Amino acid sequence: MPRRAARAALPLPDLVVLVLQGGGALGAFQAGVYEALIDLGIELDWVAGISIGAVNAAIIAGNERDQAVGKMREFWEGVSSALPSLPVVDNDWAREWTHMAAAGQVAAFGVPGFFIPRFPPPAFAERQTPEAVSFYDTAPLVATLDRLVNWDRVNNGKVRLSVGAVAVETGNFRYFDTQCDTIDARHILASGALPPGLPPVEIDGNWYWDGGLVSNTPLEHVVETANKDMLVFQVDLFPARGDRPHDMEEAWSREKDIRYSSRTRRISDGLMRRRKEHRLIDRMLEKLPAEYADLPEVKAVRKMVDCKALNLVQLIHQPPAWQTGARDFEFSRSTMEVNWALGRDAVEAAMKDGHLLADSIAEGRSDSFAVQSNALRPKAEPDVS
């Protein structure tokens, strides 16, 4: 049952979570989503991220609620400062050309406050060192995070933070979580250390790479470790649906969308299906004769069943026609502003039909929603037959 209400007349359950996936420069979309949620009076209890999502999550958890948007704006204006806004031409071909040129500049010169090209290059570095296995140095991001994030607040504040990374030597996925770990800039860098561009990060004697190599969304960690009714806003940076590509640029873009969104969709659909299956099992257990209630097998099944309500809202970045497969490493100011505005628009579109979500929360149901055709719609029911 809801425990509080946002200014958007949305009842909020025990746990409100923002889930942020990886996607480089597309993280500005996440910032727009967060700003819109704050404007609606929606308070977060937990933020979980991978890669650029971990960066945004750390800024959220590491600042007062009324300061976090400003700090996020400072971060995104900083990383886009080398490529200021150019005159916007109302022509997709011209915008695509400037978009690709901006991405090329990032590849050649790096991103201010984020990463710079390594010199000397990795071929001249000592073998089996971070310098030998990456083209860029992320030391600037450490300084940026230490300036924008209050780590004491991250580890002792009200908003729980979780970030995901993968161990290089074992391939095992790991979440660093303020509920059991002390998090600092190293953990954020580890979550976004995408090889071979960015270097692995050593934590407790182990090297870690970008968590997106295994899973680009921390939704599974959130759902499986929580034991409360929850509302989850999942920000997806790569759409599952798209048009048939016309050329190589569009093929590159579509391939990237499918590669990342398919794993995210499989996880989210699987979790919702499991939650609905648990509801059915719980109803079946209630119908068992009383003499079976104390059987070890029945107790074990009852313990496994999770019937807490889960409402999932997927806010999906829908790229303009001129954004190509380079959009996750195109950090120009004009594109950053476009992505930020798209994030705000996604939340506003969802709240136009907020009564659908409000009804589901108030009734204690588990449902999944997504913004489609500029409106919030329930996703198709997972088949539990």
How would you name each of these model-derived features?
Residues 246-288:
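Acidic, Ser/Thr-rich peripheral helices and adjacent loops at domain boundaries
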Residues 43-46, 206, 310:
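Short active-site oxyanion
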Residues 11, 155-157, 305-308:
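Extracellular/periplasmic catalytic domains that process cell-envelope and extracellular macromolecules
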Residues 122-228, 234, 241-254, 328:
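Active-site gating loop/helix substructures
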Residues 48, 164, 231-235, 311-315:
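Hydrophobic/aromatic beta-strand patches that form the interior of the parallel beta-sheet core
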Residues 1-16, 159, 166-169:
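Small-residue-rich anion-binding loops in enzyme active sites
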Residues 125, 132, 140, 145, ...:
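C-terminal helical/tail subdomains of lipid-metabolizing enzymes
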Residues 12-17, 24-133, 139, 145, ...:
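Patatin-like phospholipase
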